[in-house]
């Protein structure tokens, strides 16, 4: 005798799926500060010293306006365990850096630097890059001078402006990472 088919149902909570979108908008009266809204909660963020810019250029301090996708998480494994996320995750190594030279063929890409070699190293002492979400700003195609190393990362305690990134507290970053996947849209502007 066979056993009857018994349907099994699983409750899928919305928190078990990546967010469809995250919205970043400037704060009224202060273009270097903003608000990030996701799944019904809103957190303060720091923006670039140039505010949100529709036509981002290298070195202008602007946070690019547009819709982006997260590519991957980079994190300091020497300081933190791997956070829960739907994103691909990569531990940051001592030699990891980001090319910000528009004349270099590796512009706006991760690179490995030799000890003493200049570049935007991802191993910072100040903890701002303990968690980095790489986004697809100026990624395909990469256009020299249109901006590089635009990330979501940790904020300074006073929420001072960034060079063009969106920064937040560690608690907010960890909460956001739990719901962020490669298909999540990051809408800035």
List PLM regions with ranges:
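Short cysteine clusters
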Residues: 165
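Conserved "landmark" site that anchors the functional core of diverse proteins
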Residues: 169
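Cell wall/extracellular polymer interaction/catalysis modules
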Residues: 2-162, 173-185, 189
């Amino acid at each position: 005798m066979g056993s009857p088919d018994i349907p099994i149902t699983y409750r899928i909570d919305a928190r078990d799926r990546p967010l469809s979108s995250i919205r970043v908008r400037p704060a009224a009266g202060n273009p270097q500060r903003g608000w990030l809204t996701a799944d019904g909660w809103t957190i303060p963020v720091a923006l670039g010293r140039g505010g949100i810019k529709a036509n981002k250029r290298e070195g202008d301090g602007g946070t690019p306006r547009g819709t982006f996708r997260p590519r991957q998480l980079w994190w300091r494994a020497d300081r933190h365990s791997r956070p829960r996320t739907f994103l691909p995750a990569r531990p940051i190594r001592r030699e990891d850096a980001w090319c910000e030279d528009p004349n270099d063929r590796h512009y706006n890409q991760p690179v490995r630097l030799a000890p003493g070699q200049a570049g935007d190293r991802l191993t910072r002492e100040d903890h701002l890059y303990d968690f980095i979400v790489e986004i697809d700003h100026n990624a395909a195609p990469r256009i020299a001078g249109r901006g590089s190393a635009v990330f979501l990362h940790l904020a300074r305690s006073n929420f001072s402006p960034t060079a063009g990134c969106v920064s937040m507290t560690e608690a907010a970053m960890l909460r956001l990472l739990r719901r962020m996947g490669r298909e999540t849209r990051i809408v800035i502007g």
